[in-house]
């Protein structure tokens, strides 16, 4: 079984200094969905990317690189109507050119239910939830994943998504609307700060365990915490990326119905 990720893929032009001060850029594959799929594939898992690229040289280049990295690109869409997005990065600055590009133009009518039936999990993040056809595609994908029994996993990554949103307040409000649609949350301290005004998880747990949410992974600077509604586990932070934790969940063959019954030893096996 495979993991499905919905998001954008863009050509990232990276420089060692601020983009306006450099003459040389290094081209690489950008976008949260692309990055997550590459990390999952590197672990030996099967990761398929749901995204749309322009039917242009940049789009073909990115798709070829993802395929070389072991990502299943069979669900990628290509369009002549919009170009592949480009993002300039450097010196902690991101200048995205994506407002009228292929990634955000991926609409719900382009998604089929069949790929979700053979998937163990569906993963998404916040950058692609900006007001666009892609946000509507996320809603359809969540419904299809839930109908298929796949785990719905949300990685808000609000600090990383903020440069790609016109307003931070709109980003946070949208993230709050999507939290309870997931079965599993992967949170960072910066997520809590932006959503609830505090880095303390205790102040947010009651608000987080609503809707479909059954399992929360919380990444602190030096530790990872795992919570169900009744059990908590903790481990020293090493290299337990969300991709690795999800890979372990797939190996344990955990269906959605098993999440509320996870015990402390099982949580430790996921994060240890």
Each language-model region and where it sits:
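Short beta-strand/loop segments at the ligand-binding rim of alpha/beta enzyme cores
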Residues: 149-156
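Catalytic-core regions built around general acid/base machinery
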Residues: 137-148, 173-181
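Active-site-proximal loop/turn and secondary-structure-junction residues that shape catalytic pockets
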Residues: 128, 158-160, 191
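Glycine-rich phosphate/adenosyl-contacting loop at the front of the ribokinase-like
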Residues: 1-71, 263-272
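Conserved N-terminal subdomain of the carbohydrate kinase-like
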Residues: 46-126
